[in-house]
Amino acid sequence: RIISTRHPNSSDSIIVNWRRVGELSKMYSQGQPIPFKTISVKLLEDIKMFLLRAPMGGNKKGTISQNTASTYFSILKAGLKQAFIDEYLTVDISAKVKGITNIEKPRVALTMNEVQMLVDTPCKDDVLKRAFLFSILTGLRHSDIQTLRWKQIQQTSKGTWQAVVIQQKTKRPDYKPVIQQALQLCGIRPDDD
């Protein structure tokens, strides 16, 4: 309930993460409440170590990744920071504990040969293929392409094209350049937009 009250405009993924942090906190404390007066640097360090070996959710086997643990610990620290602001804590304990370091993951990109192979590969669903290729050329997520309308594809003052989308995940506008090849995948622009 506090999630929807404090963060009414949060995306589903943010809410899922907050809930998962709650589940893992209960798991750490074996279902017992953790009173504010017992929260200490040592407790947070213990929780940090717990998160680094915490189980995956659902029916998945194994432990969460270090980057997921980092996200969850940041959420926990944000909650404690808010508890300090709301005067449930007299000390900003969140500032006294370092977060979990994220591991940089290399971004995997398709080579031009791989893209050409995809272009040349037959597909029964032409719309799906064009949407996939549009995604490759623009960097837009499939979920954002599904809701994309012509009025969101605009010509800039320099004569180039861009897609203006409200990112489903972040709820913020994002401006993605649309090259001519990507524009051609969209077909003919209707008069009614």
Predicted regions and their residues:
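Short, intrinsically disordered, charge-balanced linker/junction segments flanking boundaries
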Residues: 1, 183, 189-193
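Surface-exposed alpha-helical interface segments used for non-catalytic interactions
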Residues: 42-45, 74, 116, 180, ...
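Basic, Lys/Arg- and aromatic-enriched nucleic-acid-binding interface segment
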Residues: 62-66, 70-74, 85, 89-142, ...
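A structural signal for short hydrophobic/aromatic patches embedded in well-ordered alpha helices
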Residues: 18, 47, 118-119, 186
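N-terminal DNA-binding recognition helix of tyrosine site-specific recombinases/integrases
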Residues: 21-28, 34-45, 53-95, 141-143
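Short, aromatic/basic-rich helix-turn unit that serves as a nucleic-acid recognition element
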Residues: 1-22
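Residues marking the start of alpha-helices
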Residues: 6, 32-35, 60, 106, ...
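Conserved tyrosine-mediated DNA breakage-rejoining catalytic core shared by Y-recombinases
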Residues: 96-104, 108, 147-188
